Amino acid sequence: MARLSFVSLLSLSLLFGQQAVRAQDYPTAVTLDCKEAMNKLRKAAGLPAFEDAVGDTFVLPAYSHEESRAAPVAETLWKTEICPKVLGGGRSRNVTEAVKLTGNFAYYPVTDGKKECSDAVEYWKGGLSQFNDTIPPTFQALNDPVVYNDRAVSFVALYNPKTSPVVSCVLLQCPNAGVGGRRLAAGTTDAVICLTNPAPLEARSQPFDDEQWKKIVDSLSLSEEEEEKGGVSPVVPSVALISAAVISAFALF
């Protein structure tokens, strides 16, 4: 009986160990509430506050492997379609879930363990530099014109000027894996991703009018002046932040 019990316990231990290893091969997506950090900047620029997004096409779903049976759509979205791009791979050939989402994305590649909403917002507002002090031009598509890279698109998503704007955010953690699922290194590559609606970027349109743009620029200039007076250096994204896991926020899909 004692031997049977020992064997049973050993088998159970191995089973849990295998399950833990398998769980490490799957991403997790934890819902974040970034409204306060985002709305602080938006209020200073005279823009309406973000509210919580509602509805499958507007909400980024939470996900963990333990609950994957109840969330097959979320597993496909994060594991198959989004994480490969976060890890620097190519676009999935069969994209079925990401294309169902609407809106524009703000994407922040986490570095140095800084994964709070405030860290993401500081990174996104740094996208102002992409426009070289001029109002964003007419948008056609990602990188058309060339100024609309991932940093610029994230900036526009943060300052979404549309009426009744909503936002949904997650902290996505993608397991570091290679081709065929081989683990390249322990740990995860993380990103804060927010989806804002209605989409501020539309083909053949400028995202901001002159008045909106002036208020945004003035609010950021005032913010920097206040930080300097308080002895705090304005946050400037590091080279590591700019280069880490660079993907197109607008064309995640």
UniProtKB/Swiss-Prot annotation:
What Pfam families does the database record attribute to this sequence? Surface_antigen
Tell me the keywords, alphabetical order: Disulfide bond, Signal
Q: Which stretch is the leader sequence? A: 1-23
Can you give the propeptide residue ranges?
182-184
Domain of life, per UniProt, equals Eukaryota
Q: Which InterPro entries match?
A: Surface_antigen (IPR021288)
Binding partners and assembly: The TA4 antigen is composed of a 17 kDa and a 8 kDa chain, linked by a disulfide bond.
Report the protein name in the record. Answer: Sporulated oocyst TA4 antigen
Source species, please? Eimeria tenella
